């Protein structure tokens, strides 16, 4: 890469990570040692790592072919997510399909694999297939940890409906699935398998995070270990506050809708908000947030962050671009829009899905 990917805003991780993750040849992630290099290797969860590995086998030792194989596979993931949303809410699924976030970030990284599994789990939740909800969330968490966050609102909804057995089934099936996927690799190659957790624990605050802004603009630099602990504490406190605030205004609100503020707060409080992480929010915007106005505001702000981020990276690499300050202003704008969306969700009556009743928050059920 020579910097044009930043100037033209057409960056993807797929091509450079073909080499960084050592996907040429027959190396098995976690099980075969990484060759010495200056970059991290095996830094993704099991399901994503082997998604990449399969794409590498299909494409041989050709980085360009590897990119196009991933384009096909990730497009299928996008189609699965869109199809699930169409079944849940036919009219609103078009929001996902036409979102600039999807168009720009679908091929930046492999997050759409986890998005597809999380959205399929959401469909299974509304069909009351709680065993499958857990299986799909477990698979999603084996691809990217964020789908595990859905266990909180989904189980809370079942408990609110006085169905503790379903909440337990959901949690246990998710845990069993995640363990079934991960345990063989942890047992056979613990050092390689643990690299994902080690890498993310040691990773410093990224350009897009509030922690980085505090350090860069206010000289309030927090050590990485303290950021990790503080982020968790802040997240627990903020989620609890949002939950209580919503319950005071609307005691019978659908608990599954907590998925939206939880995901937003994870992105705002965490130390990394990579561009493709915005894909996590799209299904929640489609299903939960009332009206298109705030969705359009988020899409505009996210587009501004995307363009100024890579323009700034172009400036860093010497091909020209906007200064860092413009990018940081756009970050603050997007954060403000997301906070506005969460406040609106707390203050306004909850949106009901087509056919959903206040006392029965499930689509016409298949017997579980």
Regions found by a protein language model. Name each.
Residues 185-233:
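Periplasmic/ER-lumenal interhelical loops and adjacent helix-loop junctions
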Residues 1-195, 228-368:
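Multi-pass membrane glycosyltransferase architecture that uses lipid-linked
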């Amino acid at each position: 890469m020579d910097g044009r990917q930043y100037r033209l805003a057409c960056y993807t991780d797929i091509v450079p990570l073909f080499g960084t993750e050592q996907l040429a040849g027959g190396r098995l992630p976690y099980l075969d040692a990484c060759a010495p290099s200056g970059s991290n290797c095996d830094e993704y969860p099991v399901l994503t790592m082997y998604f990449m590995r399969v794409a590498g086998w299909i494409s041989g030792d050709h980085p360009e072919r590897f990119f196009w194989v991933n384009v096909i596979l990730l497009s299928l993931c996008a189609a699965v997510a869109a199809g699930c949303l169409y079944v849940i809410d036919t009219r609103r699924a078009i929001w996902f399909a036409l979102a600039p976030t999807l168009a720009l970030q679908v091929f930046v990284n492999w997050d759409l694999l986890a998005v597809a599994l999380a959205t399929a789990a959401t469909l299974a939740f509304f069909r009351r297939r709680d065993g499958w909800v857990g299986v799909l969330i477990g698979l999603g968490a084996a691809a990217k940890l964020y789908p595990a966050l859905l266990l909180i609102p989904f189980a809370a909804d079942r408990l609110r409906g006085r169905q503790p057995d379903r909440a337990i089934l959901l949690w246990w099936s998710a845990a069993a699935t995640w363990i079934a996927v991960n345990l063989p690799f942890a047992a056979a190659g613990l050092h390689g398998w643990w690299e994902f957790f080690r890498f993310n624990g040691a990773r410093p605050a990224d350009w897009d995070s509030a922690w980085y802004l505090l350090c860069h603009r206010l000289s309030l630099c927090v050590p990485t270990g303290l950021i990790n602990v503080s982020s968790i504490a802040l997240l627990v406190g903020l989620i609890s506050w949002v939950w209580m605030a919503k319950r005071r205004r609307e005691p019978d609100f659908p608990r599954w809708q907590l998925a939206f503020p939880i995901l937003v707060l994870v992105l705002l409080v965490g130390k990394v908000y990579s561009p493709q992480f915005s894909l996590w929010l799209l299904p929640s915007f489609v299903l939960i947030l009332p009206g298109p106005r705030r969705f359009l505001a988020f899409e505009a702000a996210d587009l501004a962050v995307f363009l100024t981020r890579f323009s700034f990276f172009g400036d860093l690499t010497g091909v020209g671009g906007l200064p860092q300050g413009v990018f940081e202003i756009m970050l603050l704008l997007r954060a403000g829009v997301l906070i506005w969306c969460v406040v609106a969700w707390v203050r306004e009556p909850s949106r009901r899905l087509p056919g959903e009743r206040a006392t029965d928050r499930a689509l016409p059920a298949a017997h579980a």
